[in-house]
Every structure is written in C-alpha cells, then in structure tokens.
Amino acid sequence: RITKDGGVAVWVVGDATIKGSETGTSFRQALYFMDCGFNLHDTMIYNKTGLPMNHNRYEQEFEYMFVLSKGKPKTFNPIRIPCLYPEKETARQNSKYSETNEIMRKARSGKQRKPVGKDKIKGNIWKYATGKNHSTKDDIAFNHPAIFPEQLASDQIISWSNPGDVVFDPFMGSGT
C-alpha cells in the first residue's frame, strides 16, 4: 500500500544456515513479494568483504538484493564505473578474433567498430567492505545483528530515486 506505481523496494536478505543446511528463505521471500503484486525487477548481489572464515563450507560472502517494483520503475539513475579498456574497439561476441578476418570484415562492410567509452553502467554484483570503520563510522550501529554498509543504502537510493522523492525506510536506519 505504501509503494506507488513506478516505486521500488530493495529487499536485502541472506539465508541462514540451520543444522548444516541453508534455509532458502531469501527465495521464498522474493516469491512472496511477487505474490503481493511486486515485479522482481532485478536480482542483485551484495558481495561482502572482510568476513571471518568458515571452515566447514565455502564462506557465505554475499546476500541477495531483490529490486522489487510496482510496475515499471519510474526512475533509474545507473551508477557508472570506469571501463577497464577505455577507447578500445569492441570485438564481436562469440567469434575468434583474427586480425586478418577483422581487416576483411571492415573492408566488406565499410564500417569501423565503435570504441568502448570511458565508463559503463555498473553490473549487478556490488562489493562493499564490511566491519569496523568500513560499514559505518557510527559505533552504535554495530549493536544491530544485520548491519549494512551506509554506501550500499546510498547507492540503492541514488539508483532508484531522484532528489526530492520520498524514500521510506521501514527499519528506520537501524542496520546502517
């Protein structure tokens, strides 16, 4: 009832491990949101760094960030990052690169390949350092059992809203 058409909710959730098995609650929660009328607009990954090691399984280094929307999102302000090889010409996907073939192709088509720009839209796996002096400078936040980096919240808010928009935090910032 609170999210209007075009509005977005970002649900960050990880699975608990109980008696040696992951619970799968993250997927059940995403499906529940869909049953309530939300679209699952994107499934993103919050990749956590700086975690203690777990010795009986691969370390749980991520949580899901389900981007849920009422209809098509009204706003998308993509975060841009520098390209690894700016100004380099793009190669055709799924083909072996050969300088001779490239010269022949250009001669046949008369077209030059488009160079890659200096930046690109960030992918949907977002990496953040966690822990003391990384997630937040606010010591009281570390009393919360599920703290999230302030930058994660900021990046999601910037991505899905414009200045002056109403942003509702049902947890009142308790985890940031």
Across the structure, where does each feature detected by a protein language model lie?
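Core catalytic lobe of class I
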Residues: 1-176
